[in-house]
């Protein structure tokens, strides 16, 4: 099931979470993710590192697509977030890894909310 939210960020739900515990602005979230370009080229993966990623959501610590997309997931949920350039790294890109204005695809699993 696909849902398109703010910024044309698309959420494709892969497997459900608990359906009750959703992150709120400022919450510390623990996430496993793999990020790819639209062509499938992987640029980053917490799964490959064997260490989940933590951040405070909704406060500008991560790309805007995560700040608007992650709060739509409940703990345990796995989803694919497709994030257009303006809600990813925009015209700067990420030199050496992500070309300017790239749409990014993240397979994410929300492990924990604190």
Curated annotation (Swiss-Prot):
The modification Phosphoserine is found at residue 51. One of its GO terms (biological process) is nonfunctional rRNA decay. It holds the Pfam family FKBP_C. One of its GO terms (molecular function) is DNA-binding transcription activator activity, RNA polymerase II-specific. InterPro entries: FKBP-type_PPIase, PPIase_dom_sf, PPIase_FKBP_dom. PPIases accelerate the folding of proteins. It catalyzes the cis-trans isomerization of proline imidic peptide bonds in oligopeptides. Plays a role in feedback inhibition of the pathway synthesizing the aspartate family of amino acids by binding to aspartokinase. This is FK506-binding protein 1. The gene is FPR1. It is found in: Cytoplasm; Mitochondrion. GO terms for cellular component: cytoplasm; mitochondrion; nucleus. Disruption phenotype: Resistance to hydroxynorvaline, a toxic analog of threonine. Double knockout with THR1 is lethal. Belongs to the FKBP-type PPIase family. FKBP1 subfamily. Residues 26-114 form the PPIase FKBP-type domain. The modification N-acetylserine is found at residue 2. It catalyses: [protein]-peptidylproline (omega=180) = [protein]-peptidylproline (omega=0). Keywords: Acetylation, Cytoplasm, Isomerase, Mitochondrion, Phosphoprotein, Rotamase. Its main location: cytoplasm. Its EC number is 5.2.1.8. It is an enzyme of class 5 (isomerase). Interacts with HOM3; the interaction is direct, plays a role in feedback inhibition of aspartokinase by threonine, and is inhibited by tacrolimus and sirolimus. Interacts with HMO1. Interacts with FAP1. The keyword Ligase does not apply. Gene3D superfamilies: 3.10.50.40. Binds to the immunosuppressant drug FK506 and also mediates the sensitivity to rapamycin. Rapamycin disrupts interaction with FAP1. Present with 43300 molecules/cell in log phase SD medium.
């Amino acid at each position: 099931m696909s849902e398109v939210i703010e910024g044309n960020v698309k959420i494709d739900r892969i497997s459900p979470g608990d359906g009750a515990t959703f992150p709120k602005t400022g919450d510390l979230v623990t996430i496993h993710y793999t990020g790819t370009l639209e062509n499938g080229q992987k640029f980053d993966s917490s799964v490959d590192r064997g260490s989940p990623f933590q951040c405070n959501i909704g406060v500008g610590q991560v790309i805007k697509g995560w700040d608007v997309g992650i709060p739509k997931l409940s703990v345990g949920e796995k989803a694919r977030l497709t994030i257009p350039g303006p809600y990813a790294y925009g015209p700067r890109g990420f030199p050496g890894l992500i070309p300017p204005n790239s749409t990014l695809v993240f397979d994410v699993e929300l492990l924990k909310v604190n």
